[in-house]
Curated annotation (Swiss-Prot):
Signal peptide: none annotated. Transmembrane segments: none annotated. The keyword Magnesium does not apply. Its EC number is 3.5.4.16. It is an enzyme of class 3 (hydrolase). GO terms for molecular function: GTP cyclohydrolase I activity. One of its GO terms (biological process) is tetrahydrofolate biosynthetic process. HAMAP family: GTP_cyclohydrol_B (MF_01527_B). The gene is folE2-1. InterPro entries: GTP_cyclohydrolase_FolE2 (IPR022838), GTP_cyclohydrolase_FolE2/MptA (IPR003801). This is GTP cyclohydrolase FolE2 1. Pathway: Cofactor biosynthesis; 7,8-dihydroneopterin triphosphate biosynthesis; 7,8-dihydroneopterin triphosphate from GTP: step 1/1. The lineage of its organism: Bacteria, Pseudomonadati, Pseudomonadota, Betaproteobacteria, Burkholderiales. It comes from Cupriavidus metallidurans (strain ATCC 43123 / DSM 2839 / NBRC 102507 / CH34) (Ralstonia metallidurans).
Length: 309
């Protein structure tokens, strides 16, 4: 007969009687399944899970219980707000002997999406969008937020104006003594000197955080990122041929933007469609060794912060 294994978390008391705000594990690998309109895929995620430990005499929590509950998160139906709440409730219930009343979960993963080329038919590639889900159940109050990051290209409006001026001056100098200008000669000049100067542009990123209600059928991540990319107009591309690169250059020319413009575009596009969208954009400047950044939030959130202050 095998002897019972000791469990010091039950048989020993904490030497210092201090409650702990959170205890748990982080960086747990697991598969998750996302099922949304137009999207169904199993993805690799990393999870952080914690419960509170208010009982000062309890030496430790039961991490194996939390691990087992997390391992059952993928039930084949797809991750949803209600499924996440059920997990948090089960985490609390599994630690009643620790007087636990709160639980939280953080999931990090990449939303992997197949994106077609801009104009060339039959070619496409994969884009990944980093996602972070934060869920908590504190005092029976459930909260869930999603943060997703999307890459795009930004071309500086000021630099574009300076570029146009140089091209204009070069054209005027080249044809200063011409009474009539032949179209063919103008075309030839533009082919050679149209890039006399070029505006600076750079890869940029937008990180958006939204609240997700528990009664929504899914997380709505693909819909969110599609709204972000449509608002900006210049999402970074995957597979391209020359025609697609030309189309991308045209999109950049039609969507000149400062970091302020990008933040405002996204905020306007998301406000009223998603709950409490918070926008952070970053332009990794090619002109400077530093980044340009901007933040935006709904007006009601700004007012609430001012009142709280």
């Amino acid at each position: 007969m095998s002897a019972a294994l000791p469990d010091v978390s039950l048989t020993e008391a904490s030497p210092t009687f201090t409650p702990l705000e959170w205890v748990g594990m982080q960086g747990i690998d697991l598969p998750i399944r996302l099922v949304e309109p137009g999207y169904r895929r199993q993805l690799h995620a990393r999870a952080d899970i914690h419960v509170d430990l208010p009982a000062p005499r309890v030496k430790g929590i039961h991490m194996s219980r939390l691990y087992a509950l997390l391992d059952a998160l993928d039930d084949g139906e797809g991750l949803s707000p209600i499924r996440i709440r059920q997990l948090l409730e089960a985490m609390v219930d599994s630690h009643r002997d620790c007087e636990t009343g709160s639980a939280r979960l953080r999931l990090r993963f990449d939303l992997l999406v197949r994106r077609p080329a801009l104009v060339t038919e039959g070619i496409a590639g994969w884009k990944s969008y980093p996602v972070r889900l934060d869920a908590s159940l504190v005092g029976n109050v459930f909260a869930l937020t999603a943060r997703i990051t999307a890459g795009y290209s930004s071309t500086c409006p000021c630099s574009a104006a300076l570029t146009r001026q140089l091209v204009e001056q070069g054209f005027a100098k080249a044809f200063a003594h011409e009474r009539r200008v032949d179209v063919a000669r103008v075309s030839a000049w533009l082919r050679q000197h149209g890039t006399l100067a070029t505006p600076h542009s750079q890869r940029s990123e937008a990180s958006i955080t939204v609240d997700i209600a528990v009664d929504l059928p899914n997380l709505g991540l693909l819909d969110l990122v599609d709204h972000i990319e449509r608002a900006l107009g210049t999402p970074v591309q995957t597979a391209v041929k020359r025609a697609d690169e030309q189309a991308f250059a045209a999109l950049n020319g039609q969507n000149l933007m400062f970091v302020e413009d990008a933040a405002r575009r996204i905020q306007v596009a998301l406000d009223g469609r998603f709950a409490n969208p918070r926008v952070h954009v970053r332009h990794l400047e090619s002109l400077h060794p530093h980044d340009a950044v901007a933040w935006a939030a709904p007006l009601q959130m700004k007012h609430s912060r001012e009142v709280a202050a």
